[in-house]
Curated annotation (Swiss-Prot):
GO CC annotation, single: cytoplasm
Recorded GO MF terms: amino acid binding; ornithine carbamoyltransferase activity
Chain positions recorded as L-ornithine binding sites: 160, 224, 228-229
A family per Pfam: OTCace
Species of provenance: Clavibacter sepedonicus
UniProt name for this protein: Ornithine carbamoyltransferase
Binding residue positions for carbamoyl phosphate: 50-53, 77, 101, 128-131, 264-265, 292
GO biological process: arginine biosynthetic process via ornithine; citrulline biosynthetic process; L-arginine biosynthetic process
Recorded catalytic activity of this chain's protein: carbamoyl phosphate + L-ornithine = L-citrulline + phosphate + H(+)
Length: 307
């Protein structure tokens, strides 16, 4: 049966652990898996510009023996004359998998429903599951077993990153806290899904307004840009409303002594995070960026095995 990865909870707890174990192997033995040898082609479609996503998928597909076919929607029929479903049916005749960085989650769902090859969400407005796999790998490397650890995300709790931390974190059995002001809280349906998963994994979900309360006793502190692509006109308002959630050395002092700091990048220093934090000893953002490669390779290997 074809498996897709559109949301973090498309993997069960056991499957998520299996992918992370495989990522550890591939980081240690980079060319130990070659499921795309032939070579086979993987379509990598971009509606949004990217550095880390484009490089990590292109390099990862090549590492697995394949050829990355990078497509811009500006230079294709997708989203214009052709539906996502029709595009998927064309691509499946020629590629082994489809990776899509886009806007609407519904487009990914339509594409997945219309194809027999795996579809991977490389980012949507609602979720960023590949990033969370990389982050979980990074946390595991630096802090050991994921279950029982407390992960805090501060800032825009309605963002794709916050949604994915909720789902991916509780799938791993973590205690996930989102610290955000009114108007920036996660979607209720995502919170409900996370709570349902947490009830089976031993994790938990808390949505808080106070950043100090949220960070107190945390093992992992995370933030993301306050002004995402396409929201530049909201910059002044967002900086004013989210200013109290900046990750500073003073805020990090409320976490456990050996807490780590993550940020998926690109970062706006002195907005969502102080320079002394992201460039300081608790920051693991460069390991996190590298781990996009290993986590995504593991995901592709796993999906191709299932399919």
């Amino acid at each position: 049966m074809t498996r897709h990865f559109l949301r973090d909870d498309d993997l069960s707890p056991a499957e998520q652990a299996e992918v992370l174990d495989l990522a550890v192997q591939l980081k240690r033995e980079r060319w130990s898996e070659r499921p795309l040898a032939g070579p086979q082609t993987v379509a990598v479609i971009f509606d949004k510009s990217s550095t880390r996503t484009r490089v990590s998928f292109a390099v990862g597909i090549a590492d697995l023996g394949g050829v990355p076919l990078v497509i811009s929607t500006a230079n294709s029929q997708l989203g214009g004359k052709e539906t996502a479903s029709d595009t998927a049916r064309v691509l499946e005749r020629q590629v082994a998998a489809i990776v899509w960085r886009t806007y609407a989650q519904s487009g990914l769902e339509e594409m997945a429903a219309g194809t027999t090859v795996p579809v991977v969400n490389a980012l949507s407005d609602d979720f960023h599951p590949c990033q969370i796999l990389a982050d979980l790998l990074t946390i595991r490397e630096h802090r050991g077993d994921l279950a029982g650890q407390t992960l805090v995300f501060l800032g825009d709790g309605a963002s794709n990153m916050a949604h994915s931390y909720l789902l991916g974190g509780v799938t791993a059995g973590m205690h996930v806290r989102i610290a955000a002001p009114a108007g920036y809280v996660p979607a209720a349906v995502v919170v409900a899904d996370a709570e349902r998963i947490a009830a089976t994994t031993g994790g938990s979900v808390r949505i808080l307004a106070d950043p100090v309360e949220a960070v107190t006793g945390a093992d992992v502190v995370i933030t993301d840009t306050w002004v995402s692509m396409g929201r530049e006109e909201e910059k002044a308002q967002r900086l004013a409303e989210l200013g109290a959630y900046q990750v500073t050395t003073e805020l990090m002092a409320h976490a456990v002594d050996d807490a780590i700091f993550l940020h998926c990048l690109p970062a706006d220093r002195e907005y969502e995070v102080a320079a002394e934090v992201i460039d300081g000893p608790q920051s693991v953002v460069w390991d996190e960026a590298e781990n996009r490669l290993h986590a995504q390779k593991a995901l592709l290997v796993w999906l191709l095995r299932q399919s």
